[in-house]
Amino acid sequence: MYKRQKQIRAAGFNAFRDAHQPHHLDYQKYWDEEGILFWTQFSAHVWYDTPEFRENFKKLLRQWVKERRNSPSVVMWGLQNESTLPREFAQECSDLIREMDPTAKTMRVITTCNGGEGTDWNVIQNWSGTYGGDVTKYDRELSQANQLLNGEYGAWRSIDLHTEPGDFQVNGVWSEDRMCQLMETKIRLAEQAKDSVCGQFQWIYSSHDNPGRRQPDEAYRKIDKVGPFNYKG
């Protein structure tokens, strides 16, 4: 775990986002020590409208906040990624977070990502170049008022598959070269828009298997949907 943290730090990242469930507490200990900004995540696209689910969700939410509220690296509370929570329940959970962590009223923001209502902020995801879109417009898209922070960007690849250099192809072969070309373009264009955007989160540091898989039938996705990673590029 420590080696993973060191690799992330050595790669030049200055912020970390859980993907998409709570990680081991040693991660936040390291982020505290190294001054890395931490966007902690509680859940991902899950909802069952039963009293038992609601109560257990809030019980686990309280534990999550209690374990992390005194960590100086935490700057964002991520209630749910691609949220399916009803607005009223998300508001109830946000109020619970603010009750347990008064800094969430004035300093720390409560979020969903790529969908959701009832929190302070639904952070966008911009996967241009991966799921369609025009990657050459990335800097202009990030500069829009509703973008500000990109919660996810990334690229598909097939390990050890290489292609000849050339212009970027949106529907090209998922080679390592194409992945590098896309990632380099997005990093460069985000830097050009740095006065209009506060950051972007590359998805994802690691996953269980070859990241060249295709959804929805890749590997153990169906039985492993609750984590510790949800499979995306």
What residue ranges belong to the model's regions?
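Substrate-binding/catalytic cleft of secreted carbohydrate-active enzymes
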Residues: 5-7, 15-232
